[in-house]
């Protein structure tokens, strides 16, 4: 099952984790400003925006809308590897999860082994390992892990334990088992979760995620493009309705064109909302 048994570079969807950590730990706020050149040198190596686009001066909120790697690289260095990894672990990275089928553990590197350049790229969602250190490069995530990140943000910072079987019916059509919601952890405060959701609304309203818009329903989410040697994976993690989510999705399209993950997520979100009677 590739949703639970494959590790991917989460690309810019991981910026939800970096953003949440920055706000939760008072490293930066929505209105903190950064310079966003197309390429910047951090730790004696380059960090670049997609297509090396320069955005001038941006707030952290705006940098999230447009997914500016050079801003998130600076933010990662500002918070440091320790805080970045701790923030990811609050969402479940480096944590084993008891699950009915094979579930790979999503990974972050050991902070003491991370270079400044590696920390910058990790904050932007790209795992690099320039020193070939003993711990794995990070972030690496399952699709389910990124869905759980989205769910925690949608659920006022509380991450619930995932399950596969919602109910069991006997031969008479009577329900003999009903799964009960179970809290797994508190990843961030309710205030941080709301502030992050407000920023993610802007991603869909006017940023890189406009293809996820649904008429009559406010959607919040984060796009991602994970670069590989010869192709990219296209990501989207989204929630709707944004402030009272009935649905959270995480989609990765392997070797997908830019934006296709967002388009597919739109279709899934819309269908799920229709089934629930929310649209």
Predicted regions located by residue number:
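Short, gly/Ser/Thr-rich active-site loops of penicillin-recognizing serine hydrolases
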Residues: 175-180, 265-279
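Generic structural signal for hydrophobic residues
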Residues: 18, 83-84, 265-268
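Beta-lactam-recognizing serine transpeptidase/beta-lactamase-like catalytic domain environment
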Residues: 1-6, 20-253
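Intrinsic structural disorder
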Residues: 230, 243-245, 257, 271, ...
């Amino acid at each position: 099952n590739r949703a639970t048994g494959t590790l991917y570079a989460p690309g810019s969807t991981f910026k939800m984790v970096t953003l949440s950590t920055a706000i939760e730990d008072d490293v930066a706020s929505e209105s903190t400003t950064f310079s966003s050149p197309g390429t910047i040198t951090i730790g004696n190596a380059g960090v670049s925006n997609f297509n090396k686009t320069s955005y001038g001066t941006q707030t952290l909120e705006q940098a999230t809308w447009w997914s500016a790697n050079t801003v998130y690289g600076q933010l990662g260095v500002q918070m440091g590897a320790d805080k970045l990894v701790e923030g990811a672990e609050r969402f479940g990275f480096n944590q084993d999860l008891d699950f009915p089928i094979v579930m790979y553990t999503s990974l972050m590197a050991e902070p003491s082994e991370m270079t400044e350049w590696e920390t910058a790229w990790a904050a932007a969602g790209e795992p690099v390992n320039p020193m070939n250190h003993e711990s794995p490069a990070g972030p690496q995530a399952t699709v389910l892990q990124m869905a759980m990140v989205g769910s925690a943000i949608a659920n006022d910072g509380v991450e619930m334990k995932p399950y596969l079987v919602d109910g069991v019916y006997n031969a008479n059509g009577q329900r003999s088992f009903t799964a009960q919601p179970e809290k797994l952890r508190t990843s961030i405060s309710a205030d941080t979760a709301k502030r992050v959701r407000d920023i993610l609304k802007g991603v869909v309203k006017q940023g890189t995620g406009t293809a996820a818009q649904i008429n009559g329903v406010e959607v919040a989410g984060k796009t991602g493009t994970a670069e590989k040697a010869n192709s990219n994976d296209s990501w989207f993690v989204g929630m709707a309705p944004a402030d009272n989510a009935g649905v959270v999705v995480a989609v990765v399209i392997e070797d997908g064109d830019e934006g296709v993950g967002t388009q597919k997520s739109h279709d899934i979100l819309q269908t799920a909302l229709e089934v629930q009677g929310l649209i």
